[in-house]
Amino acid sequence: MASKQIMFDENARKALLNGVDKVANTVKITLGPKGRYVVLDKSTKPVVTNDGVTIAKEIELHDKFENMGAKLVKEVASKTQDNTGDGTTTATLLAQSMIREGLKNISAGANPIDVKKGIEMATENVVGYLKSKSSEVKGKEKIVQVATVSANNDEEIGNLIADAMERVGYNGVITVEDSKTMETNLDVVEGMQFDRGFVSPYMATDSEKMVCEFEDPYILITDKKINSMKQIVPVLEKVASEGRSLLIIAEDVDGDAQAALILNIIRGALRVCAVKAPGFGNERKEMLEDIAVLTGGQVISEDKGMKLEEFDDYMLGSARKVTIDNNKTIIVEGKGDKAKIKERVSLIEAQINIADVEYKKTELKKRQAKLGGGVAVIKVGAATETELKEKKMRIDDALNATKAAVEEGVVIGGGISLFRAAAILDSLKLEGDREIGVKIVQRAIEEPVRQIAENAGKEGAEVVATIRAEPRELFGYNAKKDVFEDLFEAGVIDPTKVVRSGLQNAASIAGMVLTTEALVTDFNDEKDEKAATIII
């Protein structure tokens, strides 16, 4: 085992804070409608972005102890992104403030465990306050407002997302892809989504977003388990000879078959992704038939006297595009016969009418919605590739935020919902150092307002003082217009889930850092640096 270096107590906490500050200070300049951009140096060309989690993920520090702190605050951003898809910058800022103030108090003699407990109790109270102030999202206007704010106040994006939700429903499938022109527009096409992701992360074509995207793929559908390459060699030979990609939907793909597929993917010999079939039992068979009708393929099943080894071309389906991640698969514009798709939807409708069990009716309605509901495709256009990537990131953020708003409602934006929550913590009286934890949260939840103001070129302390002096709950600073006003009336709103999740994740990581007494890592020597460049 390699020898390790260890750091204790004050020195350990100081190193962690240095790492936290380097990430948070880089990320927080992007907060608000007048936040700045950060340029990331990529291997191909620089990327310009103001997306918090994208920036945080790019930061790797030379000092290994500081890098631990950086990784912890990156975890706040990543976890918030996974939960809600937005609010990563606010979460990072909250974590930095809690960690900085907490370490200051611990250095002065406060008990770390009690401070952590105080932070947890204060966070719980603030979350309760946010939920009590949350308003349900009703109507297109509110959807436009949420999407616009999350897209860095781009009204075009806000309207596009609202239109997309109006056409496919709040829970409908909405995808984002490149446009062949400079225009950004919306199109609704036939498609389907089901809750099954790839069987191995090695199948992702984009390792940053952890998604697999194929244009014009073949689709192999079977209700059998694939555990040997021999079963699918004829299919793979056809796909490879035509230079096409392949999506495999099967009961499972494991053993030698999965290992061989991954090896060929890594070597670049095949472009293949495998997912488990959706549903269970008879429901699975019906869902596979739905996919087959949509894509113009056949379900290869021994029930029909068909075997994978006896594959024929007509058994393969296809689609214009498929997108697969860890949890779901989206098929866009299946190449199936439109008349047969309508016929299949009508058949499901007839089954709904005669179903006598409520559960069965519900499942049939879900299948009908998936097959007949369609997919909204936002096609993003821009003058340059750099602008295109940045715009797609903003649309993804806005889309995720809007879905979060539909789920848990909205609260007043501009950092005001958290700012006003500070007052309710005055009544939370705790003993000893737990009270310090409450004060740390009180200070932290004022930071977003302060930072939004500073990014807009204002004096943060003055803006905070002006808002504090005004008793109206909805009163705040609108950085976009550079005015103080009723923010709810102005349409400055945030999804409750985004604000809540960011606060909880920040408090969780802050508690871990504040109770840390030692750091253990490898020595930062030349051998480590060389190892990073070795390819095996």
Curated annotation (Swiss-Prot):
Binding site for ATP: 30-33, 86-90, 414, 494
MF-aspect GO terms: ATP binding; ATP-dependent protein folding chaperone; isomerase activity; unfolded protein binding
Quaternary structure (record): Forms a cylinder of 14 subunits composed of two heptameric rings stacked back-to-back. Interacts with the co-chaperonin GroES.
PANTHER family reported in the protein's UniProt record: 60 KDA HEAT SHOCK PROTEIN, MITOCHONDRIAL
Family: Belongs to the chaperonin (HSP60) family.
Functional note: Together with its co-chaperonin GroES, plays an essential role in assisting protein folding. The GroEL-GroES system forms a nano-cage that allows encapsulation of the non-native substrate proteins and provides a physical environment optimized to promote and accelerate protein folding.
Protein name (database record): Chaperonin GroEL
Taxonomic lineage: Archaea, Methanobacteriati, Methanobacteriota, Stenosarchaea group, Methanomicrobia
